[in-house]
């Protein structure tokens, strides 16, 4: 009997010590938006980031449109009186763009791997009060990744962006390439995580694939015009929405599936 009483008291003390789930969550960047939308109850979400309704940046824009977005974050956060603010870490235990307040803060760095995405899902799920929901999301993503078809073709790919910027190693895009059986051209050229590669150097390198953002297919300025050079146009393209790769999150599986399918279906050179 004594043991039961002690166990009951211990359980009560742990429950009492745990903070109540937040009732007013504010997200300060698009990356945090994805986690909040996937893991929090709708009634818990007070506001999303300024770009929460931007289809080029938000992978969950259809769901996000139900919620207000911030226009002047510093002012509006104070007015909203949230009990949890999520965004990029500021290096001092706070969140970038969050004014001082008594609310809890969770800083999430940019996820550069599926392992980081899993960890962040766990963090967000725990702090919003739905750890089981986070576990289910992780399990579902792992199951979907395990079910992806084995890549049929390898090759060298370059994630080439407007103004000649190429995404390098140690990034989310680099891991997605490797998952699709592709070698990142940046690794072969010894480039860092982000480097500007002149058009002439890209033409000389002749990768087997160019991975481009869907939004860059239209020529809107000189930065996008270079992606339409005749030699580059002859290289098979893998088109991926920027919203799938700008942040780590639940869209990781969609990005991996799409890259594998497009690489396998591309014409041989």
Question: Where do the language-model regions lie?
Answer:
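His/Asp/Glu-enriched short active-site or ligand-binding loop at hydrolase and phosphoryl-transfer sites
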Residues: 49, 55, 172-194, 236-239
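Bacterial Sec-dependent signal peptides at the C-terminal "C-region" and cleavage site
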Residues: 12-22
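Short secondary-structure boundary segments
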Residues: 29, 89-90, 162, 189, ...
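Basic- and aromatic-lined ligand-binding clefts that recognize polyanionic substrates
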Residues: 24-36, 132-180
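Short helices/loops that flank or line small-molecule/ion binding pockets
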Residues: 74-82, 196-206
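A short, structured surface patch at a secondary-structure boundary
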Residues: 24-80, 84-94, 182-185
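Extracytoplasmic ligand-binding site segments that recognize negatively charged/polar headgroups
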Residues: 93-96, 109-123, 156-175
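Structured C-terminal subdomain patch of bacterial secreted/periplasmic proteins
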Residues: 23-24, 115-126, 135, 213-269
């Amino acid at each position: 009997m004594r043991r039961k009483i002690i166990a009951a008291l211990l359980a009560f003390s742990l429950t009492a010590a745990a903070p109540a789930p937040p009732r007013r969550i504010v997200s300060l960047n698009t990356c945090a938006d994805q986690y909040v939308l996937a893991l929090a109850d709708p009634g818990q979400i007070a506001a999303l980031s300024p770009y929460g309704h931007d289809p080029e940046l938000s992978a969950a824009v259809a769901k996000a449109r139900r919620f207000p977005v911030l226009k002047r974050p510093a002012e509006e956060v104070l007015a909203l009186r949230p009990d949890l603010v999520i965004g990029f870490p500021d290096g001092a235990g706070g969140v970038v763009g969050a004014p001082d307040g008594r609310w809890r803060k969770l800083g999430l760095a940019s996820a550069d791997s599926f392992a980081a995405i899993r960890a962040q899902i766990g963090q967000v799920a725990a702090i919003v009060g739905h750890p089981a929901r986070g576990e289910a999301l992780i399990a579902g993503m792992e199951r979907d990744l395990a079910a992806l078809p084995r890549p049929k073709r390898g090759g060298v790919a370059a994630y080439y962006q407007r103004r000649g910027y190429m995404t390098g190693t140690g990034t989310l895009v680099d891991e997605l390439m490797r998952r699709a059986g592709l070698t990142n051209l940046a690794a072969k050229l010894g480039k860092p995580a982000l480097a500007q590669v002149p058009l002439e150097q890209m033409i000389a390198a002749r990768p087997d694939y160019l991975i481009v953002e869907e939004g860059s297919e239209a020529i809107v300025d000189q930065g996008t015009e270079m992606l339409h050079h005749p030699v580059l146009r002859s290289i098979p393209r893998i088109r991926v929405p920027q919203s799938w790769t700008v942040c780590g999150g639940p869209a990781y599986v969609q990005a991996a599936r799409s890259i594998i399918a497009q690489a396998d279906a591309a014409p041989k050179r």
